[in-house]
Amino acid sequence: MIPSRGGPAPSIHVFAPRAQLRRPQLASLTQTPHAQRTHHDRYTGLRTDLAPPTHGKQTYPETMSDIIIPGIGSLEPAPALDHLDLLAPPVAAALTALAERGVATASSALVVAIDPELADTEVMTREFGMDLALSSNCILVAGKRAGEERIAACVVRATTNADVNHVVKKRLDVRKASFWPQERAVEASGMEYGGITPVGVPGSWRLLIDSACSVGWSCIGSGLRRSKLFVTGEVLAALPGAEIVEGLGV
């Protein structure tokens, strides 16, 4: 795991490139636990409790102070673009391509190394004291139409299930939709089972993202079981072919 900075930390703070930033107020650099709790309380009442304020654009801090990932527990991730070795090759390539395209928030993506035995969402949530609603799962669904197989990567909050029989089936325009077998999912994605992620999926697949994942942070797979990726909803929405779908997660 990426070394801790030392001392108990109720939340994680994020670095971002200077060019993207608006200088934070001095008070934000010396947050007390009460100030952090107030910051977290801004999110309550929303569907996932993880969405950023809706007024204006989200900005990123110049130092380790202003951005908090609610519900991250004891994990302490680091900038993903500086640790591409912790990502599966297609994931590293896709994240790098986003940054090269000028998607500013791509540089805010974070990664953390974990024990592969803790990769499953419920196990990881329990082990690190995370909020289950922070995690978003990527589920592969397939169906056929006139002999053509159609595949969708569906991203939903871990507190919900993908509506395969209605929403996904309608989007794919197939008579029957079902989960893809593990062996085929691993082979076609180039990722490990338990680490499959929307970042870097093949361009021929549909990429359906529940609207609840398009705001706030998500903990998602890195393509490997030995690490996890943290991205904002802006990053997910900027992925090639991404479709934001209301009601995908139920």
What are these regions (language model features)?
Residues A9-S11, P53-H55:
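Intrinsic disorder/low-complexity segments
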Residues V14-A16, A35, D41-T44, G56:
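Short hydrophobic alpha-helical segments enriched in small aliphatic residues
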Residues H39-Y43, D49, Y60:
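Intrinsic-disorder-associated, low-complexity terminal segments enriched in Asp/Asn/His/Tyr and depleted
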Residues L21, L26-L29, L46, L50:
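Leucine-biased recognition of intrinsically disordered, low-complexity hydrophobic segments
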Residues K57-Y60, M64-V250:
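Extended, low-hydrophobicity, polar/charged segments
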